[in-house]
A protein has these predicted regions:
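Short, small/acidic-rich helices and loops at N termini and domain boundaries
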Residues: 1-82, 404, 411
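Glycine-biased, small-residue-rich flexible motifs in mid-sequence functional cores and linkers
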Residues: 1, 70, 79-416
């Protein structure tokens, strides 16, 4: 029953990671609801607070939320529904319930790109966001963002102008227009795209809700594009989450003299993929979605409107602003981000391989040996070596820094 899903999704003291663990032990939330203390106590990671939350069997609040959803025409998507995005389900802390308005796209059938950046964007950043949002939408991709002023909203506006698919992920209930002055965009996204939130209707924006929703933006996406972000930007949190989830991180290069570009430029230094068009982003996924992507030219005059530039310039710090990234936020990404290579894979004979591999660790040598006969898919190397994804990506980063391997389009790697 939906009431049990709502009850489970909003259990106090139960983390999203623990909810995913519980779903592995029980068939559905109804079984969890009827589980007694003895059945719950033996589960791993179960804290006292979580146990207390799970032993509270009152469904009144859940029934009230369901009534509000009916009244406000909010739809519910549960973790076990067929339409629940597979990419989102595979993150460590997926939301158990999503509330949405509008048309939910088939996330798994299309390449999805999260576009994020600063609220107080420059005219350059806003124009780039609008162009890339337009290009991704026009070429067949889904644009996911946060519906905020600045980069987020402008990118979504570009996707809507292209007639593309766009999804706004909120840090409040899906029935709340936030910020209020973004009402026109909110209504357009609701009408032509989708408004989505894990928070129950009526939940106000708060300082903790925005960082929490960022994992959904990255989790829904094949890759995250950072258009413009200062050093202490919430967009860097989304980029870090994307890297931890195994997503690509793309960055639009910014002016080195503009503070709002400092954080995004640092991502490039740490290995993010430099792009200057939406097609450069989508081309990374052309092999995965060959029938869904088409290259389209962008109108020459696709620029941010004076109203968008003015709104970003006048934007004041929000009382519920995202938790700022730590000073080391970008440097922590260095071991996780993939670098982009424009070279094409080609089998090569490495006559000096043994000499080049001297001094490498055992795991580094194992990976290099797998690439002796040419480029390989990352998934194939994982299967052959038995290394975990996280371990492999970390070793690949070190091999790149040592000049041993290079990344190729289509999730391939090869010896240099």
């Amino acid at each position: 029953m939906l009431t049990h899903w709502i009850w489970f999704a909003h259990r106090p003291g139960v983390s999203d990671r623990l909810k995913a663990v519980l779903m592995e032990h029980f068939c559905d939330p109804e079984d969890i609801f009827y589980a007694d203390e003895a059945a719950l106590r033996g589960l791993p990671e179960l804290t006292r607070e979580a146990l207390e939350g799970l032993l509270d069997k009152n469904l009144t609040s859940s029934e009230e939320i369901l009534e509000v959803c009916d009244r406000k025409q909010l739809h519910l998507l549960t973790y076990q529904d067929a339409g629940y995005p597979a990419r989102l389900k595979n993150i460590p802390d997926p939301p158990m319930v999503l509330y949405y308005k509008g048309r939910l796209p088939e996330f798994d059938a299309y390449p999805t790109v999260g576009i994020v950046g600063t609220r107080k964007a420059s005219a350059y950043g806003l124009t780039a966001a609008k162009r890339l949002g337009y290009q991704i939408g026009k070429c067949g991709g889904i644009v996911v963002s946060g519906l905020a002023f600045g980069i987020d909203g402008t990118a979504m506006s570009g996707a809507l102008t292209a007639g593309g698919k766009t999804v706004g992920v909120l840090g409040c209930g899906a029935d709340i227009v936030y910020p209020p002055s973004n009402g026109a965009l909110f209504r357009d996204v609701e009408r032509y795209g989708c408004i989505l939130s894990e928070f129950a209707p009526g939940t106000p924006p708060a300082k903790w809700t925005f960082p929490k929703r960022n994992r959904i933006i990255s989790g829904l996406s094949n890759g995250v594009l950072v258009v413009e972000a200062p050093e202490r930007s919430g967009a860097l949190i989304t980029a870090r989450l994307a890297a931890e989830q195994g997503r690509d991180v793309f960055v639009v290069p910014g002016n080195i003299d503009v503070p709002t570009c400092a954080g995004s430029n640092a991502l490039l230094r740490d290995g993010a993929i430099l792009v200057s068009s939406g097609w450069e982003v989508l081309s990374e996924y052309q092999a995965m979605f060959p029938d869904k992507l088409r290259r389209e030219d962008t109108p020459v005059r696709m620029t941010a409107s004076p109203e968008e530039v003015r709104a970003a310039a006048e934007e004041t710090p929000l009382q519920v602003a995202q938790k700022p990234a730590r000073p080391s936020e970008t440097s922590n990404l260095k071991k996780k981000l993939e670098k982009k290579s424009i070279d094409n894979p080609a089998p090569t004979a490495y006559s000096d391989l043994d000499a080049r591999l001297s001094g490498l660790s055992e795991d580094e040598r194992v990976i290099a040996e797998c690439l002796k006969n040419g480029a390989r898919l990352v998934d194939d190397v994982i299967a052959e070596t038995g290394l975990s994804t996280g371990r492999l990506l970390g070793i690949l980063t070190m091999l790149e820094l040592k000049g041993i391997v290079r990344r190729l389009p289509g999730k391939q790697i090869a010896l240099k």
